[in-house]
């Protein structure tokens, strides 16, 4: 009954302006009649639990029913999370201040609580730093993240006033990057999303994707203009073109020109090991997406997501989670 209620909320919460935009995108991509697309989207919502964004970004408009049925859609993903994750532990991940305390040993960089910090603690935190990252405590998709430069503030106290006014109270030193990660897009901290599933005490890696910034932006999230691609779990090599939230496809990074497919990411085994270790910390939360940076000396977790989106591994240029072929 809870899942039926969730589906009903999804259907009744449709934002028709955004839905119309997705219908336009489908028409531009394949020429499909817009009325047909509208009703096909409704059918996919009922049959597969797919929202209009799922329909467009997964390429449902160009698939058979059997192929559509291999995808982890919005409603199905919610069901997975409900089965594998105890909601009593939501704040361990959704509250970034709490997460930074709970998983401190995996972060490998100093953090500070801007809500409680004194000017003296802020001054000590900023010592030797050119810039820091400041985030809102409950945010997603890269929203509410700023890179603050020390030179732009008269004093540590002035920066503290600013972050409290803007509610950017999750403070972190800028994570240094391995050269092979930085060269993809030097202005952003580029991260792997490593999704782990804890089943019967064993950690399994479901997928790995790579998120990269673009256009000089400091955020690698596709919701903030970044791009993403699939990574081979065994080799750590990029195994798909990149795409963005506007369904553009890139064989090379659009800014640095680096060819993507076949690019070897560094320290993949160390990154997988760290994700698997972190996955055991809260066994009541078995399905987690870990955003992992690779520093010069090893991996570091940026954050954990207890409701990891399915778009990161199933966008149209990628393979579905279950490969299926038909005669």
Question: What do these predicted regions represent?
Answer:
Residues 4-124, 140:
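Conserved N-proximal alpha/beta basic substrate-recognition cap immediately N-terminal to
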Residues 292, 298-312:
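A short beta-strand motif that forms the metal-chelation/ATP-contact edge
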Residues 174-175, 179-185, 211-295:
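A long amphipathic alpha-helix within ATP-dependent nucleotide-binding catalytic cores
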Residues 320-327:
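Residue-level detector of conserved catalytic or cofactor/ligand-binding positions
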Residues 150, 198-202, 233-235, 295-298:
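Short acidic-glycine loop/turn motifs at beta-strand connectors
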Residues 83-201:
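Active-site nucleotide/adenylate-binding loops and adjacent lid/helix of ATP-dependent enzymes
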Residues 184, 190-197, 203-211, 219-221, ...:
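Beta-strand scaffold of nucleotide-dependent catalytic cores
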Residues 217-220, 310-320:
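A short, polar/charged loop-to-alpha-helix boundary motif
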